């Protein structure tokens, strides 16, 4: 009913198990979660996007969702807003260090998607996207679009809507500059730009058994 009332073009259903664990009113029973997702998808007439909430989607979850016929995802990886920390603070408790670091970073979730999703899947990147450079890297890793929330909300609250609009324009202009410098006419063409991978992300690629040289030369078409 809500989809029809809003004349929505799509429905985004979020996964937030980690957040629920630290919510006083949280639902800690995840039994039947996948079946519920399928039921929702089958009940609506618009595409359903499966979205995480700051903990990322790993290859194993992509595969499980693909098996159930889902083809649109928002990885919403770790690196941005930490919802378990927000819920813990709301209750006046401290989130321990081991759980404060829980989640798949957005970059790693995109790399897992590279190796898992078919080319016709829709892949959105969010979670720690703060700059034009972040957006360019996400597009280079195969994202079809990027999502940004926290900086916009902060600007609206502290400086007003106009400041948030200026921020979006600045991001768009910055992305265009990256595209020009890299010889790309569209964000999608950033996927053809060779990558240099170092540090923990290089270790992640090795631990996953992905072929580094091939991945650095080609991503989702």
Label every PLM stretch briefly.
Residues 97-122, 130-221:
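Alpha/beta catalytic cores of nucleotide-metabolism and tRNA/nucleoside-modifying enzymes
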């Amino acid at each position: 009913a809500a989809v029809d009332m809003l004349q929505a073009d799509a429905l985004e259903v979020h996964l937030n198990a980690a957040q629920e664990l630290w919510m006083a009113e949280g639902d800690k029973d995840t039994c039947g979660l996948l079946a519920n997702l399928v039921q929702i998808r089958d009940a609506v007439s618009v595409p359903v996007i499966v979205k995480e909430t700051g903990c990322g989607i790993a290859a194993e979850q992509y595969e499980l969702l693909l098996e159930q016929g889902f083809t649109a995802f928002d990885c919403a990886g770790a690196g941005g807003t930490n919802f378990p920390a927000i819920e813990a603070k709301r209750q006046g408790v401290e989130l321990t260090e081991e759980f404060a670091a829980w989640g798949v970073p957005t970059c790693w979730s995109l790399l897992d998607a590279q190796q898992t999703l078919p080319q016709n899947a829709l892949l959105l990147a969010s979670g720690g996207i703060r700059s034009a450079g972040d957006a360019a890297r996400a597009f280079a890793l195969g994202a079809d679009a990027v999502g940004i929330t926290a900086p916009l909300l902060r600007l609206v609250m502290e400086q007003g809507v106009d400041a948030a609009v200026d921020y979006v324009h600045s991001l768009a202009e910055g992305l265009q500059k990256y595209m020009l410098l890299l010889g790309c006419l569209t964000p999608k063409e950033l996927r053809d730009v060779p990558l240099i991978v170092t540090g923990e992300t290089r270790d992640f690629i090795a631990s996953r058994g992905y072929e580094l040289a091939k991945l650095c030369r080609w991503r989702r078409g």
